[in-house]
């Protein structure tokens, strides 16, 4: 807003979303934590989640677009990098389509979470009323 922009675009990609899935899985999570990184979160948009890191690098190289990587990405000091550099490559040897498969899995988990959220919202609209500052919950049968 300070510079006249309504949103900020971040270059997270499909591999980042997969890493987030595994980080949340390792920490212990519910369904929402297995939905990876979301395309929109408030004023943050992530327009590259459809593409893998490799696809983005290939595109940048083919079109002469400079690419920089944070040197901390090579350190296994961080859980994300341990997953990126250790676990994911092993899973890719087991299934070369791992990135696409995980993208589809994350998409299905996201759809399930959205469905649950809609169901809860419907139940809340039907069962919860507020009048004169008093909240009433009517059990449904």
Regions found by a protein language model. Name each.
Residues 1-6:
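Glycine-rich phosphate-binding loop signature in dinucleotide/nucleotide-binding domains
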Residues 7-11, 16-105, 109, 136-140:
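Catalytic subdomain that performs nucleotidyl-dependent activation
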Residues 113-141:
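Acidic catalytic cores of enzymes that act on phosphate-bearing nucleotides/polynucleotides
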């Amino acid at each position: 807003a300070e510079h006249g922009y309504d949103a900020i675009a971040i270059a997270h990609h499909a591999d980042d979303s997969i890493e987030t899935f595994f980080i949340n899985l390792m920490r212990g999570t519910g369904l929402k934590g297995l939905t990876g990184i979301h395309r929109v979160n408030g004023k943050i948009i992530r327009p590259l989640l459809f593409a893998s890191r490799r696809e983005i690098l290939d595109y940048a190289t083919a079109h002469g677009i400079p690419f920089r990587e944070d040197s901390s990405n090579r350190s296994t000091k961080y859980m994300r990098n341990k997953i990126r550099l250790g676990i994911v490559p092993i899973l890719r040897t087991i299934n070369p389509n791992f990135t696409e498969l995980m993208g589809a899995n994350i998409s299905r988990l996201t759809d399930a979470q959205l469905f649950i959220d809609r169901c809860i919202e419907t139940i809340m609209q039907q069962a919860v009323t507020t009048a004169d500052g008093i909240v009433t919950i009517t059990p449904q049968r």
